[in-house]
Swiss-Prot record:
The chain crosses the membrane at residues 12-31. This is Biosynthetic peptidoglycan transglycosylase. Keywords: Cell inner membrane, Cell membrane, Cell shape, Cell wall biogenesis/degradation, Glycosyltransferase, Membrane, Peptidoglycan synthesis, Transferase, Transmembrane, Transmembrane helix. It is a single-pass membrane protein. Pathway: Cell wall biogenesis; peptidoglycan biosynthesis. It comes from Ectopseudomonas mendocina (strain ymp) (Pseudomonas mendocina). GO terms for biological process: cell wall organization; peptidoglycan biosynthetic process; regulation of cell shape. GO terms for cellular component: peptidoglycan-based cell wall; plasma membrane. The keyword Membrane applies.
Length: 242
């Protein structure tokens, strides 16, 4: 009886893992129609007098400005081109900081944030963290770095009901994402720790200071030349359509 139940559970786990892997593989080419975070925000608003209206419009990689790509990397994950989904040094530093009694500090890479935003609910439980690690590994396995950043920039929250670079650019600055300048891009990146608390379009002193620091980091990282490190490097025999 117990052995049969164990076998069934293992079989179920296998099929769930296979289904999740196929889903992540498909999203290498297909734009995600929505995210788990968008659904969560929509559900949160059901009890309010005015339900939340979600705004999001997909922009492909070549229509997203280099300023914004670099601003987000500088602000959120400066080792993005180097790691395989997890920044061990940042994790160790965050653990030491949290154990010292300071305010909770995260150490999520862009890859982890994509996994969390696309597939998972909010929270810090161990089951959710385990699923985040699983989806992060799949994303790093199946997607090139450019695709990870493309999905991130089209899915990240930038205000109440505002998701993705295009909606954020229009909402905060009245322009399309391709027309964001360097300062505007840095202000968008500056509010990412808490985009529902801070405004990129109406920055306070903290956001302005952080945006200035982000612009310095963009320069130190090499500017748009850094993005060359994100290009996939395949052997000559690799099919170009993959």
């Amino acid at each position: 009886m117990l052995r049969s139940l164990t076998r069934r559970l293992l079989k179920l786990l296998f099929w769930l893992m296979l289904a999740s892997a196929l889903l992540v593989l498909a999203l290498r080419w297909l734009p995600p129609p929505g995210t788990a975070l968008m659904l969560e925000r929509k559900i949160e608003s059901w009890g309010s007098e005015q339900p939340l209206q979600l705004k999001r419009q997909w922009r492909p990689w070549n229509e997203l400005p280099d300023h914004l790509k670099m601003a987000v990397i500088a602000a959120e994950d400066q080792k993005f081109a180097e790691h395989w989904g997890f920044d061990v040094g940042a994790i160790q530093a965050a653990l030491a900081h949290n154990q010292s009694g300071g305010s909770l500090r995260g150490a999520s890479t862009l890859s982890q944030q994509v996994a969390k935003n696309l597939f998972l609910w909010s929270g810090r439980s161990w089951p959710r963290k385990a699923l985040e690690a699983w989806f992060t590994a799949l994303i790093e396995l199946f997607w090139p770095k450019e695709r990870i950043l493309e999905v991130y920039l089209n899915s990240v929250e930038w205000g109440d009901g505002i998701f993705g670079a295009e909606a954020a650019a229009q909402h905060h600055f009245g322009v399309g994402a391709p027309y964001l300048n360097r300062q505007q891009a840095s202000q968008l990146a500056a509010v990412l720790p808490n985009p529902r608390r801070w405004s990129a379009g109406r920055p306070d002193a903290y956001v302005n200071r952080r945006a200035a620091w982000i612009r310095q980091q963009m320069t130190q990282l090499g500017g748009s030349h850094y993005l060359n490190q994100l290009k996939p490097r395949y052997p000559e025999w690799w099919p170009r359509w993959l």
